[in-house]
Amino acid sequence: MARTGAFFYPARPHDRALTVAGEAERLARGALRHLRAGRLGLASALPRRVPAAAPPAESHPTGPPVLYLPAVSWSYRFQRPQHLALALARAGHPVLYVDGFLRSRLLPARRVLHTQGGLHVLRMRVPGRPDPYREPLDRRTAALMTETILAGLRHERPLMVLVQLPFWAELGRELARRLDIPLVYDRIDLHVGFPGVPVRIETVEARLIREADLVCATAGLLAERPREVSPQVLLLPNGVDLAAFPAPAAVRQSGSPVVVGYVGALGPWFDVEAVAAAGRAFPDWRFRLAGQVEDPEVAALAGLPNLETVGEIPFADVPSFLAGLDVALVPFRDLPLTRAVDPVKLYEALA
């Protein structure tokens, strides 16, 4: 039972059993998806869930709470959504991080996963199990989820509802309307630039931009369109928590091979050809890639004897991984999607 601070969502009978069943379904579906794609070996087919960073130390934030509708699940690769949620909590604002990304019929309707330091991760079962990156919430589902969220609010009026994905547009509008609070859209990606995203998502996002009280953008290109329709646009680039990246203690010994590496998703935007060319041009260098393989073309790199893929690593291991590199890469293809990014991995490498 979570009964601390600004939110109260008591556990219900069978919640734990449903959570276990939902996780088992996730693993099974992920394994089938990978095997159908032709990847070899059951171990590599099973999807890995990288542990998310722990919530902030226990505290009692006194500011008005924030309703946070993020771009990724709390347990996904640690990036801007999780960093910003932690920063808001540490700044004294209780945060309700609504996690509706696990697509399972077996989940409890809602369950609080974390309740430390003013950060509350509320996992919710989304009726109909829509794909959050390709299918926006409909009005009826948004209304049902609004009632669930409002039922757990205690006393203080929230500071704002923050939306990071067009998927949440209807829910964000409904919460803002019911509570009479500002609607803030944090535009962190060119969403329609991702493979398979339908054009209608652009229409949903355009309305969200028009109706938001404030639009934040991580990069200049992402701020251009909002500025055409609203003066309330803030360029808010990414950054890095320097405390999490202490200066490395060891210095590379003379004569040891140069180590080149990358941390992040190995998706369609990853320039496989450029990395392969570099690997062939410098056969005495070692290349290390840390991240989930999301593009089958990455398999072509397996033929390089001086390159290894180490898989997804927890955020806690990123500083030591980067400290072991002589050169950090951000090898993105020239795409509309990549022209609009402000890569967190660049800040982390420079830290």
Name each model feature, range by range.
Residues R286-V298:
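Glycosyltransferase donor-sugar binding loop
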Residues G193, E211-L235:
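A short, active-site helix/loop in glycosyltransferases that binds the activated sugar's phosphate group
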Residues L84, T148-I149, E174, P198-V215:
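Membrane-proximal helix-turn-helix segments that form the acceptor-binding/catalytic region
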Residues L221, L236-P248:
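Carbohydrate-associated surface elements
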